[in-house]
């Protein structure tokens, strides 16, 4: 089996470059007030920057972050489902469309905005030439505070695989049957469920903990071969 690595920001490199990105995605699903578990919530890590909602008649309903009763949330979700990847779970708070905001200073080849992974276009094209699977860059709408700014793209990282049950505490309740909320904190020693991991994509999010980004050995080797900056890698066990 291929080796898998937890991909995170290289804080030291980011600090050395000193650049910053601020923004939010153009559209999003509302949060949900669940009538079953009683929780009002919105998830993180589910972002589809290449999905365009501009043709929807109710486009404005996706422009403002807010909570809605679960029934209304589910109605709005169904309107975008055909535009999103077929396997996408689309929980409350899922974001769509370009990242809109500002950027300044110098950035590493890979740059992060919380759970959003950005990349310079030229670096992405060099990386794609080494043929890692499934890398897709999406346009951003970032205003730069300098002349001749670089072009930053956001990588669309879709959820695949899951954490193995052995690293999930036994007292964590199962996901809500209505809204899907899974009240799991990130395990200190994550283990990936080997049988669930994809074989046709080299960079993805963990399906049941989407703020974790995972890269395959092929992706990590390509990044190292090109000496691209901005990422750290920690190998994770599979079971």
Regions found by a protein language model. Give the residues of each.
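Cys/His-rich microdomains that often coordinate metals
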Residues: 38-41, 182-183
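Short microdomains enriched in Cys/His and/or Lys/Arg
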Residues: 49-90, 188-214, 221
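Short coil/turn motifs at helix boundaries and re-entrant loops, enriched in small/polar
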Residues: 117-124, 212-219, 223
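Residues immediately within or flanking Cys/His clusters that coordinate Zn2+
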Residues: 28-31, 173
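Acidic (E/D-rich), amphipathic helical modules within compact regulatory domains
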Residues: 112-113, 117-158
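A glycine-rich, hydrophobic loop/mini-helix early in the fold
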Residues: 84-106
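Short cysteine-rich clusters marking metal-coordination/redox-active sites
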Residues: 34-37, 176-179
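Short, intrinsically disordered, charge-biased short linear motifs at domain edges
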Residues: 14-27, 156-169
């Amino acid at each position: 089996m291929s080796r898998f690595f937890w991909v995170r920001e290289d804080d030291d490199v980011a600090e050395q470059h000193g650049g910053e990105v601020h923004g939010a995605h153009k559209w999003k699903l509302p949060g949900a007030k669940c009538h079953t578990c009683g929780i009002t919530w919105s998830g993180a890590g589910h972002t589809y920057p290449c999905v365009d909602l501009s043709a929807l008649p109710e486009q404005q309903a996706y422009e403002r972050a807010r909570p809605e009763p679960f029934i209304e949330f589910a109605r709005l979700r169904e309107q975008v489902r055909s535009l999103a990847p077929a396997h996408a779970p689309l929980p409350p708070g899922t974001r769509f469309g370009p990242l809109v905001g500002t950027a300044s200073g110098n950035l590493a080849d890979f740059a992060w905005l919380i759970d959003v992974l950005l990349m310079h276009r030229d670096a992405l094209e060099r990386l794609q030439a080494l043929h890692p699977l499934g890398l897709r860059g999406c346009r951003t709408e970032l205003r730069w505070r300098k002349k001749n700014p670089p072009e930053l793209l956001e990588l669309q990282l879709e959820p695949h695989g899951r954490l193995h049950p052995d690293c999930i505490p036994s007292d964590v309740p199962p996901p809500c049957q209505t809204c899907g909320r899974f009240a799991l904190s990130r395990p200190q020693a994550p283990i990936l469920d080997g049988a669930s991991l994809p074989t046709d994509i080299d960079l993805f999010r963990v399906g049941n903990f989407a703020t974790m980004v995972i890269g395959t050995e092929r992706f990590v080797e390509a990044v190292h071969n090109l000496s691209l900056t901005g990422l750290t890698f920690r190998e994770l066990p599979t079971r």
